[in-house]
């Protein structure tokens, strides 16, 4: 990869390579854009096949966070960290302490949070070295587990998508096929069940499927069969890239709305489902509840305030649909356009994360 050429093409600001020989830390921090504020994005720990693969993942994820944070209406830019290693056996306290010192050295340009392969406990260790971390334990004034917040945002966005497709945002009696019944999807199923939706679920973990069947009266199907079931709404809540050449011909749903990241295998698949008349709620807009929740910590966490902001995902999805109609484009393109328009509006303004010469987090420290 020609790194500087790639950074210039996609407007990346900074890439930092971090290593600590004593702890075994090998990390890459990618900061894509800080026009709207400091870059916020989680720390992912994964056993990558190569350093180049890790770099590509960090860059891709950082850019995605710019769009997610902008579309969510947050005064935050986009960044991401990847730590190269097996989260099951390579973690140690010294590693996360060292990583926290690297974050502190960025002086607030990047704020981290948990992601795949990291936990709240890991964030607590990082917090010993830097204030620039969210998603720490509630006893430190944090929001705790972000899964319920993410699920509530998906639920709100799904209602907006239902209104677009069916003329009403009521989910009562609607058949929703949920792919994956992990932490986020479990809470989503609870919201859907309480409104009277009928659930079809699948997961490679039979225990979580059994729980959904018992608690929500869901119907269980084989993972390979979920795409072709008769349903009103398909909710991808597991792996990315599941809207692809193989799965699209099987789909019977009128709506796609779920919590999974990077649902479209390629952009052209968004074009295909658009031409089919399927209403697609873009993933990074509908699944922003978690990042909205942790971002509220920067102001001193207030659950009521955070949940009100998460409720607005309904409005954000409606805005995406309006832009799609206005410009005659697929919704995935409209989501990008909504985020880009907000960033461009602010590009010449003074960065909001410096207020009266002080970083936004100075308010949290003062409490």
UniProtKB/Swiss-Prot annotation:
It catalyses: L-leucine + NAD(+) + H2O = 4-methyl-2-oxopentanoate + NH4(+) + NADH + H(+). The active site is at 80. Pfam families: ELFV_dehydrog (PF00208), ELFV_dehydrog_N (PF02812). NAD(+) binds at residues 180-186. Changing residue 114 to V: Completely modifies the activity of the enzyme, which is able to catalyze the reductive amination of ketones, and no longer displays leucine dehydrogenase activity. Changing residue 291 to C: Completely modifies the activity of the enzyme, which is able to catalyze the reductive amination of ketones, and no longer displays leucine dehydrogenase activity. Pathway: Amino-acid degradation; L-leucine degradation; 4-methyl-2-oxopentanoate from L-leucine (dehydrogenase route): step 1/1. It is an enzyme of class 1 (oxidoreductase). PROSITE patterns: GLFV_DEHYDROGENASE. The keyword Nucleotidyltransferase does not apply. Changing residue 68 to S: Completely modifies the activity of the enzyme, which is able to catalyze the reductive amination of ketones, and no longer displays leucine dehydrogenase activity. This enzyme has been successfully altered through several rounds of protein engineering to an enantioselective amine dehydrogenase. Instead of the wild-type alpha-keto acid, the new amine dehydrogenase now accepts the analogous ketone, methyl isobutyl ketone (MIBK), which corresponds to exchange of the carboxy group by a methyl group, to produce chiral (R)-1,3-dimethylbutylamine via a reductive amination reaction. Signal peptide: none annotated. The keyword Magnesium does not apply. SUPFAM superfamilies: Aminoacid dehydrogenase-like, N-terminal domain (SSF53223), NAD(P)-binding Rossmann-fold domains (SSF51735). GO terms for biological process: L-leucine catabolic process. Belongs to the Glu/Leu/Phe/Val dehydrogenases family. PANTHER family: LEUCINE DEHYDROGENASE, VALINE DEHYDROGENASE. Catalyzes the reversible deamination of L-leucine to 4-methyl-2-oxopentanoate. This is Leucine dehydrogenase. It comes from Geobacillus stearothermophilus. The gene is ldh.
């Amino acid at each position: 990869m020609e790194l500087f050429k790639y950074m210039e093409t996609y407007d990346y600001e900074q890439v930092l390579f971090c290593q600590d020989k004593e702890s075994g830390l090998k990390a890459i921090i990618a900061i894509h854009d800080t026009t709207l504020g400091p870059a916020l994005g989680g720390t992912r720990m994964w056993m990558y096949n190569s350093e180049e693969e890790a770099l590509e993942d960090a860059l891709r994820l950082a850019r995605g966070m710019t769009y997610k944070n902008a579309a969510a209406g947050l005064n935050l830019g986009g960044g991401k960290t990847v730590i190269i290693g097996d989260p099951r056996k390579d973690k140690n306290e010294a590693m996360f302490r060292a990583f926290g010192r690297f974050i502190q050295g960025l002086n607030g340009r990047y704020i981290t949070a948990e992601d795949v392969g990291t936990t709240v406990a890991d964030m607590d260790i990082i917090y010993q070295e830097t204030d620039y971390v969210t998603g720490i334990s509630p006893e430190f004034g944090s929001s705790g587990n972000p899964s319920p917040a993410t699920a509530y945002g998906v639920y709100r966005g799904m209602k907006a998508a239902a209104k677009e497709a069916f003329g009403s945002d009521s989910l009562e009696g609607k058949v929703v096929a949920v792919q994956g019944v992990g932490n986020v999807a479990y809470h989503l199923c609870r919201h859907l069940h309480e409104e009277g939706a009928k659930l079809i679920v699948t997961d490679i973990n039979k225990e979580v499927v059994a729980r959904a069947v018992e608690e929500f009266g869901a119907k269980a199907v084989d993972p390979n069969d979920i795409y072709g079931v008769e349903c009103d709404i398909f909710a991808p809540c597991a792996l990315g890239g599941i809207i692809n050449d193989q799965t699209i011909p099987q789909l019977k749903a009128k709506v796609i709305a779920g919590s999974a990241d990077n649902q479209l295998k390629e952009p052209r698949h968004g074009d295909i489902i658009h031409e089919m008349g399927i209403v697609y709620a873009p993933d990074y807009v509908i699944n922003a509840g978690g990042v909205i929740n942790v971002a509220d910590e920067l102001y001193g966490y207030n659950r009521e305030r955070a949940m009100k902001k998460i409720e607005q995902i309904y409005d954000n999805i409606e805005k995406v649909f309006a832009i799609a109609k206005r410009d005659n484009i697929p919704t995935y393109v409209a989501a990008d356009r909504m985020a880009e328009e907000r960033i461009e509006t602010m590009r010449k303004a003074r960065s909001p994360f410096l207020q009266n010469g002080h970083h936004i987090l100075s308010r949290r420290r003062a409490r």
